[in-house]
A protein has these predicted regions:
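N-terminal onset of structured domains
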Residues: 1-26
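Glutamate identity and glutamate-enriched acidic tracts
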Residues: 2, 25, 31, 103, ...
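Domain-scale recognition of soluble eukaryotic interaction modules
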Residues: 6, 10, 39-124
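Eukaryotic intrinsically disordered and solvent-exposed regulatory patches
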Residues: 13-16, 29-30, 48-50
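A generic structural motif
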Residues: 16-17, 34, 67-72
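Short glycine/serine/proline-enriched coil/turn segments at secondary-structure junctions
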Residues: 18-22, 35-37, 53
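Hydrophobic/aromatic-rich, well-ordered segments within soluble, folded domains that form packed cores
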Residues: 21-29, 83, 87
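Proline-anchored loop/turn motifs at beta-strand termini and strand-loop-strand connectors
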Residues: 29-41
Length: 124
C-alpha cells in the first residue's frame, strides 16, 4: 500500500452555507491500495476534528462513498471537491464513529458547535 504523507486541505465550503467547519483547515492522510482506482483510497484526518463521523483518536472517517459506494469513476478531485466538503457540511449522526459528537449534534447543537470551534481553534 502506498502512503502519501498528508495533504493540507481547506475544503471548498460554500461560504453562503452556515457550516460550523468552514473556518478550519486539516491535515489528512490518504492511503492508496494496489487496486486503486478499483478500490477506494483510505482517507483520514491527522488533525483532530470533532465530528460525528470521525473517530476522535484515530482520525478514521465513516463516509459511505469511500466504504461502500466507490467506483473507478471517482478520483482525488471528487474526494477534495465534493466528498469531503459535503462530509463537513452534513454530518450524519445516524452512522457515527464518535457517539458523543453524534449525541450532541442531535440533542444540543449549541454545545456541539462550541466543541467544534474549540478544536478548530486548538488544532487548525
Amino acid at each position: 500500500m502506498e502512503y502519501y504523507r498528508g495533504v493540507d486541505i481547506h475544503p471548498s465550503l460554500d461560504k453562503n452555507k452556515n457550516s460550523i467547519y468552514k473556518t478550519g483547515e486539516w491535515l489528512i492522510k490518504i492511503e492508496f491500495p494496489k487496486q486503486y482506482p478499483y478500490k477506494s483510497p483510505s482517507v483520514g484526518f491527522l488533525t483532530k476534528i470533532y465530528h460525528p463521523n470521525v473517530d476522535y483518536n484515530s482520525g478514521t472517517i465513516c463516509l459511505n462513498v469511500l466504504n461502500k459506494s466507490w467506483t473507478p469513476i471517482y478520483n482525488l478531485v471528487h474526494i477534495y471537491n465534493i466528498f469531503l466538503p459535503q462530509f463537513l457540511m452534513y454530518p450524519n449522526a445516524d452512522d457515527p464513529l464518535n457517539i458523543d459528537a453524534a449525541e450532541l449534534f442531535l440533542n444540543n447543537i449549541e454545545e456541539f458547535n462550541n466543541k467544534v470551534l474549540l478544536d478548530i481553534k486548538k488544532y487548525c
